[in-house]
């Protein structure tokens, strides 16, 4: 996958009152305009994105949850209505109902954040579903009461229409707003990575062609596929687009769910609730996959890295040897390092000092080796370094560089300065990527033999074996 860097821009910034106020006013006006343009049948909008968007904004940026910011959003709604409608005082009640949804969802999500609840838990999606349900009901009660005088419908049909619209748009938009992020780089997808999205488009087309109430569920398998393959951000965005498109297509009878009978509000009520219920499924799956992936990374991190020294563990080293970056390996040098007289450090200064020595030692070795090799703790005070190279001499030079670097590096413990030394055994030979693990194991045996020779001959030395002879 190729990536292209893109610049990032933040609309809201903490502590910038004027900037945030202008942004809230502009955003409210923009999405009020979009919703007003979708008033196709009655005075009520077919699809009202404003409340979901603003609820997501206030929920996402905790520091925006201030009375004056909410007031600015409310005033923006009133100003728009004053310019474009003749609702008069009725506008106060209708827009207050909008604020009911925004404030309810925002405060409930902010409460979850303060309680430290994970945003990528499956239960998080279910909580959002419930929050939108509660907020939509409160919004619908106030809105239906306020809009009776400007709409030809009675209270109960208005309540059903208002509730279903707020609930469906909330479930579609709020998760999208909470997860939306501008990536630092723009990925270029491969053809096979686009298959779930293509399947989603085909399923929506099938809904149009086949029709019927059941056709609204056609995109669900494709959305589940997207949830498994894509990130929660992409999944929520695709779910929102799919749900919004279906609602618009149903309202315009492009997707015919009326089965020969005249289209009515109860059918729109059912369609919206069905789409909202369907939408939460891929979001829950996506959050589940994200949680599992996060857990797997933590497990892999614990298995592949030594907790104390933060270098590879034994198993992690073997996994690293499988990396495609080592495909050009022609020669491999394996070093076994043993800190000299480490037991006396534990005996004289305590195990806490010993742990600190191991940590500092590993960090120093990692700094010397850099990206030229792999460093791992094999157990106790014994470490291994694997250096893939083209020239056999490179590994031996690296071993001596490590030995001298350790010898010259002072270690301070409780105002006492200690100097460490290390004995190194080196195994060196030809290697290829296909057999790299086997080659490593063979050279480990050779390095272990040479390490024994280094310790036997007085420690603080590097030993290697060439052509059957031992060279120090």
From Swiss-Prot:
GO terms for biological process: cell adhesion involved in single-species biofilm formation; negative regulation of bacterial-type flagellum-dependent cell motility. Its cofactor is Mg(2+). It comes from the Bacteria. Pfam families: GGDEF. Pathway: Purine metabolism; 3',5'-cyclic di-GMP biosynthesis. Residues 330-467 form the GGDEF domain. This is Probable diguanylate cyclase DgcF. Substrate binds at residues 346, 351, 355. It catalyses: 2 GTP = 3',3'-c-di-GMP + 2 diphosphate. SMART domains: GGDEF. The lineage of its organism: Bacteria, Pseudomonadati, Pseudomonadota, Gammaproteobacteria, Enterobacterales. Homodimer. InterPro entries: Diguanylate_Cyclase, GGDEF_dom, Nucleotide_cyclase, Rev_trsase/Diguanyl_cyclase. Its EC number is 2.7.7.65. Catalyzes the synthesis of cyclic-di-GMP (c-di-GMP) via the condensation of 2 GTP molecules. Mg(2+) binds at residues 338-339, 381. The chain crosses the membrane at residues 21-41, 44-64, 90-110, 128-148, 167-187, 198-218, 237-257, 273-293. It is an enzyme of class 2 (transferase). Binds 1 Mg(2+) ion per monomer. It is a multi-pass membrane protein. GO terms for molecular function: diguanylate cyclase activity; GTP binding; metal ion binding. It is found in: Cell membrane. Keywords: Cell membrane, GTP-binding, Magnesium, Membrane, Metal-binding, Nucleotide-binding, Transferase, Transmembrane, Transmembrane helix. GO terms for cellular component: plasma membrane.
């Amino acid at each position: 996958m190729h990536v292209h860097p893109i610049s990032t821009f933040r609309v809201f910034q903490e502590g910038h009152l004027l900037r945030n106020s202008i942004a809230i006013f502009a955003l409210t006006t923009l999405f009020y305009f979009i919703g007003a343009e979708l008033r196709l049948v009655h005075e009520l909008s077919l699809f009202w994105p404003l409340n979901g968007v603003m609820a997501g904004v206030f929920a996402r940026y905790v520091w925006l949850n201030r009375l004056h910011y909410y007031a600015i959003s409310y005033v923006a709604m009133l100003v728009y209505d004053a310019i474009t409608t003749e609702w008069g005082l009725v506008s106060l009640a209708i827009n207050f109902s909008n604020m009911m949804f925004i404030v309810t969802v925002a405060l409930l999500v902010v409460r979850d954040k303060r309680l430290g609840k994970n945003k990528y838990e499956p239960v998080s999606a279910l909580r959002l579903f419930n929050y939108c349900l509660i907020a939509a009901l409160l919004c619908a009660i106030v809105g239906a009461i306020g809009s009776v005088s400007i709409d030809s419908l009675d209270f109960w049909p208005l309540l059903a229409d208002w509730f279903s619209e707020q609930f469906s748009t909330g479930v579609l938009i709020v998760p999208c707003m909470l997860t939306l992020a501008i990536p630092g780089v723009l990925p270029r997808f491969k053809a096979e990575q686009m298959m779930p999205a293509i399947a989603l488009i085909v399923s929506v087309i099938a809904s149009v062609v086949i029709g019927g109430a059941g056709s609204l569920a056609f995109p669900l398998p494709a959305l589940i596929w997207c949830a498994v393959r894509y990130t929660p951000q992409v999944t929520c965005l695709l779910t929102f687009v799919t749900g919004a498109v279906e609602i618009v297509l149903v309202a315009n009878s492009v997707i015919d769910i009326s089965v020969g009978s005249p289209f009515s509000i109860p059918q729109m009520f059912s369609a919206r609730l069905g789409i909202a219920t369907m939408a939460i499924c891929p979001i829950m799956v996506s959050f589940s996959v994200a949680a599992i992936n996060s857990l797997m990374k933590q497990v892999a991190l614990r298995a592949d890295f030594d907790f104390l020294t933060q270098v590879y563990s034994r198993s992690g080293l073997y996994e690293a040897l499988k990396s495609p970056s080592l495909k050009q390996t022609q020669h491999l040098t394996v070093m076994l390092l043993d800190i000299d007289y480490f037991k006396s450090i534990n005996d004289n200064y305590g195990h806490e000092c010993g742990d600190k020595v191991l940590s500092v030692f590993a960090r120093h070795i990692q700094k010397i080796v850099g990206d030229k090799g792999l460093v791992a703790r094999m157990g106790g005070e014994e470490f291994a370094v694997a250096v893939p190279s083209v020239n056999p001499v490179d590994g031996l030079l690296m071993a001596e560089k490590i030995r001298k670097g350790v010898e010259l590096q002072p270690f301070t413990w409780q105002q006492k300065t200690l100097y460490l030394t290390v004995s190194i055994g080196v195994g060196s030979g030809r290697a290829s990527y296909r057999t790299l693990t086997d080659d490593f194991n063979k050279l480990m045996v050779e390095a272990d033999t040479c390490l024994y020779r280094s310790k036997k001959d007085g420690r603080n030395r590097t030993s290697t074996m060439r052509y059957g002879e031992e060279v120090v």
